[in-house]
């Protein structure tokens, strides 16, 4: 490799650490005959970096199956947690932007955080904070001072699908006020978990009235409505644990 090529590669790697927008801006200024070459090289470097991060995160957090999108415009990876090694864990779909996702906020039925981010997942499918840096939560991809370990697994976007959830109750079903089959199986599971006592006939009846949750294989039955999707979106890791006991436990 010539000295000039080495300098270009070194600059490209430095830009990669600074964020994707800067890197693409740098590549766009290259001569046309070099642009495609370095664009391809950059995407490969980015893919390898993100894949390594995701693998380490999955290993550290015990995530057994997941799918994820790569939101390049932010400059760091967001992983969508879709399941864990715990048989009692809830299938809860949350984008996280930092590997500080520990037991305090991990979605399980015994250590379940009922206030945040569940409430945000319940009422909103967009960004929690569009001005996340001004909120002094996360600056430049790093968690701001004052947030202890386990406090910030920043849920920027969280939802099971785009259908709006409601406070459904068994009485509403009996009266015919709602159609349980309007929602997908995953949404209906969440609604039943939120609005029925654990290990009760009411919960089992509510679950039976809805659409059964589909097995996630090959491709999920939802789509993420985002203008920032990439060809690597919806990569599915097909080794999910059993989830027969999704609705057991206490909230």
Curated annotation (Swiss-Prot):
Pfam families: Lentivirus_VIF (PF05851). Keywords: Host cytoplasm, Virion. Its main location: host cell. One of its GO terms (cellular component) is host cell cytoplasm. Determines virus infectivity. Belongs to the feline lentivirus group Vif protein family. This is Virion infectivity factor. The lineage of its organism: Viruses, Riboviria, Pararnavirae, Artverviricota, Revtraviricetes. The gene is vif.
């Amino acid at each position: 490799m010539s000295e000039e090529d080495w300098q270009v590669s070194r600059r490209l790697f430095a830009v990669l650490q600074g964020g994707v927008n800067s890197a693409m801006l740098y590549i766009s200024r290259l001569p046309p005959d070099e642009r495609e070459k370095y664009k391809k090289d950059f995407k490969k470097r980015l893919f390898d970096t993100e894949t390594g991060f995701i693998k380490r995160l999955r290993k550290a957090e015990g995530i057994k199956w997941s799918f994820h999108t790569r939101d390049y415009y932010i400059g760091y990876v967001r992983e969508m947690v879709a399941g864990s090694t715990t048989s009692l864990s809830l299938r809860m779909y949350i984008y996280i932007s930092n590997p500080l996702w520990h037991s305090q906020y991990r979605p399980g039925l015994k250590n379940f955080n009922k206030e945040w981010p569940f409430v945000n997942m319940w009422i909103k499918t967009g960004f929690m904070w569009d001005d996340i840096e001004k909120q002094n939560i996360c600056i430049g991809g790093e968690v701001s001072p004052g947030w202890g370990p386990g406090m910030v697994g920043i849920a920027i976007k969280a939802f099971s699908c785009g259908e709006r959830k409601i406070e459904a109750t068994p009485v509403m079903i009996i009266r015919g006020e709602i159609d349980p089959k309007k929602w997908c199986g995953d949404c209906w599971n969440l609604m039943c978990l939120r609005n029925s006592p654990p290990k009760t006939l009411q919960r089992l009846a509510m679950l039976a009235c809805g659409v059964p949750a589909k097995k996630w294989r090959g491709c999920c039955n939802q789509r993420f409505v985002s203008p920032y999707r990439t060809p690597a979106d919806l990569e599915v890791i097909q080794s999910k644990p059993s989830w027969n006991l999704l609705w057991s436990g206490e909230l």
